[in-house]
Amino acid sequence: MEIKTYKIKDICEASHGREINTKYLRENQGIYPVYSSATSNEGEMGRIKTYDFDGEYVTWTTRWSYAGSIYYRNGKFSASSNCGILKVLNKEINPKFLAYALKKEAKKFVNTTSAIPILRTQKVVEIPIDFPPLQIQEKIATILDTFTELSAELSAELSAELSAEL
């Protein structure tokens, strides 16, 4: 099995969202999620009438204590300026696999020496990731999805049991 190593800049287009504040969210309420640098609610800060992105993307939080948090997005959405966005351009790369691989690597590249932790685009695009063949990436992503779902269910059940005991 051949493993290929790519830097993000060699397989993705990197960008950021736009300036979206709470006033804009209030005045433009709709059905499309807006993602920010927050991590609660999967990074969703609200919903608006329009969208800027449509398809499979990987996003990351660029600032604050959760800088480097990685998310897989699939569908129509917008993003705030504190949300980095990767669009996979290489057909040999599964976006969901990329998201899982980046979750493992991104935190290593966060600048924690500044007053506000930050993960700049210039750092993200230099991150090297090892990729097995596409079929293997898809299998790994499916396995990790299943594990993530089971883990969330188990956590919810344990929380419910602990709450019931108290």
Regions inferred by a protein language model and the residue ranges of each:
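Non-catalytic DNA-recognition/assembly elements of restriction-modification systems
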Residues: 1-18, 28-38
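Amphipathic alpha-helical segments
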Residues: 3-4, 125-166
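Short, recurring structural edge motifs at helix starts
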Residues: 20-23, 113-116, 126-131
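A short beta-turn/loop motif at secondary-structure boundaries
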Residues: 25-27, 118-121
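Short, structured segments at the rim of ligand-binding sites
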Residues: 25-28, 51-53
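A short beta-sheet element
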Residues: 37-42, 46-103, 115, 120
